[in-house]
């Protein structure tokens, strides 16, 4: 963070009087007032301040599994004529925050196809989570940080990637949230909610609706939903390299096991997670019936940029 230094009123008077000895006796620290250019943003820790001195090298990593329980072979399924994994790569390449995009997979069928337009890193097939798969890539491909992008979101807005990348500059991890706009998502345990500090750091993620509105508890769900700006968590993560490699060394945490949310392992072990608030909502392909819905959305939007 940039600072500017100015003399205190007493020091200024001494300087004008030419009494340099008096100034020296007061001491440099007593004469200087350091005024942050932004009074809200705290100083960066020394081990992290370097990220502001240059552009971070961030790599987008898309974990891709063939053996999906609800939709086997999903990454290769065509979405309006183009396989899903290629759609996701194309969207990621629209983000100027990413230096490179990598598909991380344990399946040779996905790898053989993706090599035609993207770098591929083969990973083990026993990873318990996407975070562990990303960490394996990070152990071989050096960068300042990594953005974990879901492989089933062919409409990913590059502005969300940019926001998560920017939030990572002064945090261990970063992610994104968006307002809950649909009442059907308000009490849905498959829609993860997040609450943050005033400065945008994650306090907690839950499948339950948080915060609990005590004064509105007896009201209808619609009334509760309308009375507070509830935030939906989007499944995109940014990790600093050192954070990622440390994080996967911790065992599954109690809260992670209870909620089945891997980001809680980070919070329980003291890592900070910056949450970028965005307007774009995620539209994923979870089951085969989602394909028609996504294709309709694609048809109603501008043409999609294809890989070079």
Regions found by a protein language model. Give the residues of each.
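Short, positively charged and aromatic/hydrophobic N-terminal segments
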Residues: 39, 51-52
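N-terminal glycine-rich phosphate-binding loop and ensuing alpha1 helix
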Residues: 57-104
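A conserved hydrophobic position in a structured secondary element of the catalytic/binding core
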Residues: 105-106, 156, 239, 286
